[in-house]
Amino acid sequence: MGSPFGYYDPNKKSLYLENINKVKDLPQRDGNFPAIQTLILDKGFHILNYETNYEFLKYESVEKFKDFLKEQDLEKAVGNFDTNKIPTESYRRFAKALMTDGNKGFFIQKPKLDFEIIALTSPYNLEEEIFEFQLFEKGDPLENWQITIFSRDEENNYKEIVKTNPNGMGKIKIFDNRTYLISAVKLDKANYIEKLKYKSDWFSLWATLVFKK
């Protein structure tokens, strides 16, 4: 479900904890490990939100970039590109983690990020086996988009792929004692000004949502 990492402030654009009543910014220290450390005093359902600044990536080869496009079902969206040049990319992450000490206080976030997955139901409701979510780009639902679901229990790892409906919504069946990571990627070609500023051919946005059932 990813590798542990230390906190590095220049990567951060925003970091905050949200519940049904308030939003709390979370200042951290460089080098903190685990990267995010905070004491949650309020009871109920919380969402940890982390947004990064742009970071730079150069692919190892054109083939690696093609593999990425195929894996994320982005080949049609990208179309033709210069295969004589190893692609470069600037990427941002929009990561969320759902947390609770029970099933009270669930709320649905209002979309306000450039790219994000919003939980429409609580995975902690013991009466529900279906988890519903919605994908947004700059406040608008993103339809017919690939969502990749990684999950694991004590013995196995699992992978599932679904598509959002015309309202940007998706749903999956969830199982007890599993950790879930729901992921979506948006990739756009850099315009002339962006290429000059960021030295990148492509810009990507990564939205993730993590919870443990």
Range-by-range predicted roles:
Residues 1-36:
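Start-of-domain marker
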Residues 7-11, 140-151:
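Short, ordered, surface-exposed loop/turn motifs in non-cytosolic proteins
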Residues 15-23, 146-161:
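Short amphipathic beta-strand segments in non-cytosolic proteins
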Residues 31-35, 164-178:
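Glycine-centered loop-to-beta-strand initiation motif
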Residues 43-47, 128, 177-179:
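Extracellular Ig-like/FN3 beta-sandwich strand-entry sites
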Residues 48-51, 179-187:
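A short, solvent-exposed beta-strand micro-motif common in secreted/extracellular proteins
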Residues 52-61, 188-193:
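Short acidic/polar inter-strand loop motif in beta-rich domains
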Residues 68-131, 136-141, 153-155, 192-213:
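Beta-strand-rich domain onsets/edges
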